[in-house]
Amino acid sequence: MKPVLNCDARSALHRAGFSRRTFLKTSGALIVTFNAGWKNAEAQFGGGPSAGSPPANQVDSWLAIAADGSVTAYSGKEELGQGIATVQQQLVAEELSLPFDRVKLIYCDTALTPDQAYTSGSQSHPANFNRNNLAQACATAREALFKLASERLGIPADQLSAANGVITAKSNASKKVSYGELLGGKKFTLTVNTAAKRKPASEWTVLGKPIPRPDLAPLVTGRFEFVHNVRLPGMLHGKVVRPPAVGATVMSVDESSVKDLPGVVKVVVKKNFVGVVAQKPWQALQAANKLKVTWSPGAGLPSHADFYEHVRKQPARDNLMVDSKDVEQKLGEATTVLKATYLHPYQMHGSMGSSCAVADVQGDRATIYSPTQGVWYQKTTAAMVLGIKPDNVHVIFRRGSGCYGLNGADTVTYDAALLSQAVGKPVRVQLSRKDEMAWENYGNAFVMDERAGLDAQGNIIAWDHESWSPTLGNRPGPRTPGNVITGYLAGFEPDAFAPRPAAEPRGYNNGSNGIPSYFAGAVGGTPRGTGTVKSERALAHIVASPFWTGPLRSPARLQNTFAHEGFLDELAAHVKADPVAYRLRHLRDPRLIAVVKEVAKAANWETRPSPRPGNRKTGTAIGRGMACVLYEGDNGYSALVAEVEVDQDTGKVSAKRFVVCNDVGPVSNPNGLRNQIEGGALQGLSRALGEEVTWDDQKVTSIDWRTYHTLPLGFDVPKIEAVLLDRPEEEATGAGETSITLVAAALGNAIFDATGARLRQIPFTPERVKAALAARA
Amino acid sequence: MITLKVNGRTHTLDLDPATPLLYALSDDLELRGPKFGCGLGQCGACTVIVKGQAIRSCITPVKSVEGAEITTLEGLGTIEKPHPLQKAFIEDQAAQCGFCVNGVIMTAKAFLDKNPKPSEQEIQQAMSGVLCRCFTNVRMLRAIQRAGQEMAR
């Protein structure tokens, strides 16, 4: 198959004098297991990098320096809108002592870049900025270049310095040689050396600086190419026809119903997948609307009103995260036992632009432009959907609308592939708003029970957490296209759901933040949690979902944190303790303690118990609340203070101020980090105040922006202040999901502080707030 | 045949008169500014300016704007010579994925042209029908305010 390179990649390779394929094939690289950023993917899907991926342990897989000195870096972590491309470019420039704009970064193209599984789960920093992969490949390359320069100039490497791609003798500026001259357009042919010395943060001049994103200018002037803008010669347009109800199947399709419409090329049916291809998108839409499809009745849906009770009663696959085995006994000995149930609805990614992909399937070969978060997984699963060999599928990432997790990106890619295969021409598909919203893989609904025992001094002596959450499908991974709607309609099954009792926890894993921050987390004897409560149990029940589910920014972590941090606040209020002081009393991780203290300081936190003394029970009341988390148990420390105003007559909640403190290890780009903290905080606010998937007895009813309630751009936006704790000596962690994880909890705690009413169900709609106010003691 | 005047150029296109303007702009003229977000006039991603008004091109039939001067995001400025709004968005790094930016800037442009010195509240009000799902609100609203001051000079 002829690899289709984008212009930038092609010109870089042309300058370097070889094709990328040839380049890697002839590298003589020994393929051994190497961590390409597989932490989450391995846990979820097993296995390792895909066949055909440039080997992660080879410098040449990550870096090419042409004879003219131009530097091209290759990454398996893509730009989804969070600035990760910019910071990867900064990283390469820093390690190689180059100006930022001398580095060209190419990411996520199965003909060019290493397989780093999904770009997801706040894993791009851990994957590429610590002691492996892109960062370490650059460090290895730097050492190799210094060695070559030392030989060439006859000067010991420690008496050389590098700047602007030139290595110069420290004592004699006239003795110098450029990277391009040293390599002469050849490969490195080097294994990544995990011991190669990284540039210390104290010497950084590019990394750690607020370098502006190069994609901003094309974005704001309408020059940027989204996947929506990909146009291929002879390209046609497709529209899909989704079932009218959950579980409905195709009985018959009357193709004659659209045969006279202008521009219609073909009606495509594959099992329950139905679509139309036309010359132009407007014609495709007309045809999709008019196509007569007879569907079987839907399967019927559980009542929305009683859904949380329904969820509790379903057969479950259990996951025991920690169990000290003495929780019931200690609760029996406690002076006081408190209980509460927290509820979180299904929420959607609700991407601003509905998902889009362009596929060109010709015979047994396919070239696909996709906004997928995992090009290599799309390659193998699209091959399954098309019934062709994965080797014959070339997937090229093109940015879609911000996804925040598994939106319609993968499913629409299968849509485009199936329709293109049926007509043998390139086909572009963009979903309708309704098709995006009614069938995406929603963020999980959660029911969470919390129970804790306090001693006579008000200390927590035992805590039990139990949750129920429904699941159906997921990311497709390397072999499950049926995990999203199109794959399923076309005849593939989603991951099987089998109830099973919990096994004993085998190690400490708080990837879902199911374990509260206050637990000692003693699995197998050694405490690995961030807290002090030794009598502890955390148990999750996974049950079957009637709707598709998948990761939505801070999946399960946000829901669990809402319950844990709200409940901690309830305990503090019960013993009339200050919420910050009470947290600190039960925490032992120094970095988590540090973010809590720093955020309290920055927010001018007033030390006192909640509710706020002197607040009246009518009119407007103000209050403050806080929440903290070690995201995923090891991936970023964050604490957030929310200040709110509650209109007790209307039930309207207004956030006035958020103060966030983040410790994500070394800060790659402070401005980019602030952008993520701000965006996460406001997205969290929208999710806490309004967002909820709704349905009737047959179908989803939240299908547009009138029925799914997001905050608009213009509203009474709270002030957001971010405090960044830079820790260059620590490992880099993710930062895209920290602030969002804390908002619902901090907001609920602030509402309690303002009013004395506890909100335990998301979203905090005015009706729910008024009901909670009416129920106050 | 439909004649459209876009960013100072005239185009004659063979289109069903009911075709929404957005389809003509993004598919026939291959413009990258206006975008399909919802097709329902609810999110703003498709916004263009016609006769000084920010309109939702996804629900505007081409026939209804035939002959009128249509300005898209591309028509405001270029990478080399950005409009003050575009410049402010770059300076404030006021975007994440960038999909909504068209609707935000075009809506703000039409608003600022009529209200040269708006208050923070007036800007919020003017932008209350536009969505950004990455929630870059703080920076975007700040950039609009700064651009407004620049444009009023």
Residue ranges and their predicted role:
Chain B
Residues 1-153:
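Signature of N-terminal electron-transfer/Fe-S-associated modules in redox systems
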